[in-house]
Amino acid sequence: TVHIRGRIRVNSWRLSEDEAERRVRALESNPPIEQDGNTIRVGHIQDSSLRRNVSISYEIVVPAETRVASMTGSGNQTVAGVQRPLRVETGSGDLKITGVSEARANTGSGNIEIESARGNVYAQTGSGNIQAYDIDGGFVASTGSGDVKLRQAASGSVSVETGSGNVEVNGAKGSLVLHTGSGDITADGVPRDPWKLEAGSGNITLRLPPTAAFDLYAHTGSGGIESDHPITVQGKVNRHELRGKVRGGGATLEASTGSGNIRIQ
């Protein structure tokens, strides 16, 4: 069973009271809901004269196994408990997603928050922060301007890019690719697969377990490199560049910043 509740709002300062009332009554008598078999489409107002200066907020309750694709030109969206692949988009607004399987979230301008996902997650915003917690799969995120924070709960590849903002990843258990044009990068986890971290301008901090074994390449254009882990250095020792093996070597760990310090803890 699907339950749909809508709240109609009319910008009455641009319309007469009678015209505003007419539009509300027209939408109430013929709500923008279409059903074709098992597919339900909500929110498409065919009459262009009714669309102007009118907005509708929806509260929709569906079975957990419903496939949901939700798109709006402007507005916030909250989705919880959907166990089929989910797609959520808004031109401008915040997105909050909780307790889902696979999810794709996109906003032109706004923040994205995702918690407890059992599959892969894809998140993109033109301007805004991205936060994702307890992700049980892969994670791909990008923002033109904003911070990205991830707490990973199970193995999966991670790719994060921000034009300007900080990147923080906790519990990484798979391959890791992190990039920021301007901002700091902080990552902790177990580098069993290749890690590549790049900052145009900012510090890079890695927190690794005391038993971690990996091949290290670290480079900074302007800054220092410090490591709490024993490194068998390969090549010349240089304040701005370090190459070597930690505990016999393993997966490749590459960290580079144009301007900033690199610290391996």
Per-region residue spans from a language model:
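Intrinsically disordered, low-complexity terminal regions
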Residues: 1-265
